Every structure is written in structure tokens, then in C-alpha cells.
């Protein structure tokens, strides 16, 4: 096993999915704890010679916060801290076992991160400054090292259907990510 789908929470088999697939979102400790458990499981199952990926939701569901910018800003803040905590665990696992794990954000329509521009903006405006400062303090390392860890362990799950629905050219998307130092950790071919 080299990849896990951490987007849906637990055993998700409801008749009507809609926005509930985003619950719990990255503003809640429940999502953090769930992802930390997935990280431990993948570290055990992952063959030594492979990288491991866990796909996850694009932070939250955008329509929940359309009219409330302060709450939306808080979601970006908490998500960045919680994702940095997952990265801290992934760094520890790599130090102890040599296994490289990464968390792959999966942008999609109506997600808090929908497209390439929003991915780049999230990394530049939230994850790297907020998550980087947290990770630097938590691991007692320089900010530059924390930033490098975030860029190594937080990537994008590129779903062909989701980006097609956003009318984004794949070459342009990959160039935007590369220019921002953001890696693609997983590609999902879907229609």
C-alpha cells in the first residue's frame, strides 16, 4: 500500500453526500486526529522503497463561508496549523524510518481551494507563513527548514476531472505549481 484516500472521513457511505463529504473539515481537530492516524497506518504499510501519499480535502467547503470572511480566515489559519502538525509527524517518521510521506490537497469545485491559483495563494498566504512559523517553533528549527519540510510533505492531488471542470490547462497548472515550488504528489485520472 502506497496511497490512502483521506478525503472522506471514516466509513463514508451515505445516500446523499453533497457538502457532508467535507466534514469534518481542516478547521477541526477531528480531521487532524483522523489524518494523524492515517499517517501512522500508511507508515506501517508502506514498502521501504516507495513514497506514500494521503489525499485530503481542499481544507473545507467554500459555500459554508461565502458570507463570513472572519470565519473563512480562521479556517485557513487553523488548517495551516493542523497541516503543519501532520507534517511534523511525517518528518519524524522520515527521520526514524527513512519513509517519505506526503499529504496531498485535492482541489475541486466548491472546495475552499478550487483551482491552481487558489492552491498557490493558499501556500503563499497561509500554509508557508502560518504553518511554517508553527512548524519552526514546534520542531525548534529555522523557518527556512520548516518551509522546506512543508513543501516536501504537502503536495497536490491533481484530479483530471476537477481541474477540467475549472477549465484549467494541465500544462499551465503544472507550470504554476512548479514556479511556486509546489509538488504534485498524486494524479487521479477520472472523468
Predicted regions and their residues:
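Repeat-solenoid scaffold signature
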Residues: 158, 163-168
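Short, well-structured secondary-structure segments
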Residues: 1-6, 52-56
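Short glycine-enriched loops at secondary-structure junctions
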Residues: 5-11, 60
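Conserved, mostly hydrophobic/aromatic
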Residues: 1-4, 35, 119, 159, ...
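Generic beta-strand/beta-sheet core signal
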Residues: 106, 157, 187-190
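Catalytic-core regions built around general acid/base machinery
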Residues: 1, 86-89, 176
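Active-site acidic/histidine proton-transfer and metal-coordination neighborhood
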Residues: 15-155, 165
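A short alpha/beta connector and helix-capping loop motif
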Residues: 166-191
